[in-house]
């Protein structure tokens, strides 16, 4: 159970990988009982009869069996979803990172199509003219790893900490060791920086200029503008300016691509184009206003777009989910989720974030594994016991949190800890669950099983290093703030 699920009126813990089937079962009921919005289907060139043929196999009996949910609950939620306006169906990472994630996400999006929830307030919007930056797929990462293994990469520049945030099952860390020269732009000696031959620290965020473009669709063209609030404390340089300086030194086409004296000049030139595209003429006045408001929050009418369902009557059919690990040897599904405090680990060096209690378990200053009470009882595990979590890829030891908000056939470990370095507050604290993730293979393509790795859990001892806020034994004590 996530913080979102805990805030919900109803929690429906479907079996991992069955969420797409659940969506199609709801879609079948909505179509069969004519609860859809006719105008919305017509706007997308769809006919209910054609869609119903595609989802007819997803009857309540089958969906209940595959998801582990009751038929009555599925039907009740489907009818309530169709009769409530606005209603929104969203697929999170737990769905997208399954082996059948793409089709499951499309199945969930189809629910929004049926109730006319595209291009309207409270629904789904495409980006309204926001610039599209470069994207990198898993295939791109695997191709890079292949090149590094083949000694085709002579120098690598890193803005981030992939040594910590990329699952070792991909072979990334091993391949990186074959690159002769590594450059890191981290402001801390993180797991990647300690491997680097050269570290060029970036400004801190509060020392930096920049722009922020939301990934989610909005009706307005939203571009947030970052501006420094303090002067740089140390002899650092902002990452884009280092690249611009290097481009100037290289000359030729590289120098011509960045004809700016500074990153701020480049940022102003980019914003000037956007202001002109929106009909503005006085850029200096507009720039001052942008600094005051923090960005651009208006859509150019010529940039507005609408979503349309592109699949026609072809209903997405999620395949059976693939899981790494034999079910008999590894009976539990592993869920790895971003920490509310550290996200993927980038906030781990900050002691006030380490001190921030997890909103669901109240745990602080470490890692833990969440286990359902029924499962814990079967395994002889008590709250705070040190346990070993083993997958086909590896194992780690963490204390157990007995948590009713998780399915009995699952365990969950938050991301964020397990750093080799990154300062005194992060170094050697907790464990990195990414080391448990194995690879699944469908056809010729292998990918990390982000939410598709099976594990087993065994009790090691009664004493685990688990600290929680408000622990009945008083194990939580603040050395940072005393009131």
Q: For the regions a protein language model found, what residue spans apply to each?
A:
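Long, well-ordered, tryptophan-enriched scaffold segments
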Residues: 1-85, 91, 239, 249
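A glycine-rich, hydrophobic/aromatic-adjacent loop/helix-cap motif
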Residues: 81-150, 215, 302-312
């Amino acid at each position: 159970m996530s913080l979102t699920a805990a805030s919900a009126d109803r929690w429906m813990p479907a079996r991992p990988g069955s969420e797409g089937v659940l969506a199609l079962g709801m879609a079948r009921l909505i179509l069969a009982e004519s609860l859809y919005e006719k105008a919305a289907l017509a706007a997308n060139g769809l006919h209910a009869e054609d869609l119903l043929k595609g989802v007819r196999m997803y009857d309540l009996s089958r969906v209940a069996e595959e998801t582990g949910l009751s038929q009555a609950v599925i039907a009740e939620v489907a009818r309530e979803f169709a009769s409530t306006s606005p209603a929104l169906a969203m697929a999170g990472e737990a769905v997208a990172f399954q082996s059948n994630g793409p089709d499951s996400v499309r199945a969930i999006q189809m629910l929004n199509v049926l109730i006319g929830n595209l291009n309207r307030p409270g629904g789904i919007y495409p980006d309204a003219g926001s610039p599209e930056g470069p994207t990198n797929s898993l295939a791109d990462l695997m191709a890079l790893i292949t090149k590094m293994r083949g000694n085709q990469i002579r120098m690598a520049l890193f803005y981030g900490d992939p040594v910590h945030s990329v699952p070792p099952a991909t072979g990334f860390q091993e391949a990186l060791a074959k690159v002769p020269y590594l450059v890191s732009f981290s402001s801390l000696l993180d797991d990647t920086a300690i491997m680097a031959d050269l570290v060029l620290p970036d400004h801190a965020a509060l020392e930096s200029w920049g722009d922020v473009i939301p990934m989610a669709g909005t009706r307005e063209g939203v571009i947030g503008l970052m501006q420094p609030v303090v002067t740089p404390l140390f002899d650092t340089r902002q990452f884009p300016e280092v690249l611009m300086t290097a481009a100037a030194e290289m000359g030729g086409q590289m120098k011509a691509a960045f004809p700016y004296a500074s990153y701020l000049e480049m940022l102003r030139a980019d914003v000037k184009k956007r202001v002109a595209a929106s009909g503005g003429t006085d850029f200096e006045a507009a720039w001052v206003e942008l600094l005051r408001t923090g960005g651009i929050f208006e859509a150019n009418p010529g940039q507005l777009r609408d979503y349309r369902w592109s699949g026609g009557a072809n209903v997405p059919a999620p395949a059976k989910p693939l899981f790494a690990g034999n079910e008999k040897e590894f009976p539990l599904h592993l869920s790895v989720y971003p920490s509310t405090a550290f996200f993927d680990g980038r906030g781990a060096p900050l002691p006030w974030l380490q001190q921030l209690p997890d909103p669901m378990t109240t745990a602080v200053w470490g890692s833990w594994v969440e286990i359902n009470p029924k499962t814990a009882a079967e395994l002889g595990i008590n709250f705070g016991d040190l346990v070993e979590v083993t997958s086909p890829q590896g194992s780690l030891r963490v204390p157990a949190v007995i948590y009713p908000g998780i399915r009995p056939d699952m365990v969950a470990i938050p991301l964020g800890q397990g750093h080799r370095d990154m300062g005194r507050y992060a170094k050697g604290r907790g464990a990195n669950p990414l080391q448990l993730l194995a690879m699944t293979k469908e056809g010729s393509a292998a990918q990390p099983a982000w939410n598709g790795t099976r594990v087993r859990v065994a009790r090691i001892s009664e004493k685990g290093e688990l600290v929680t806020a408000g622990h009945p034994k008083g194990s939580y004590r603040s050395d940072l703030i005393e009131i």
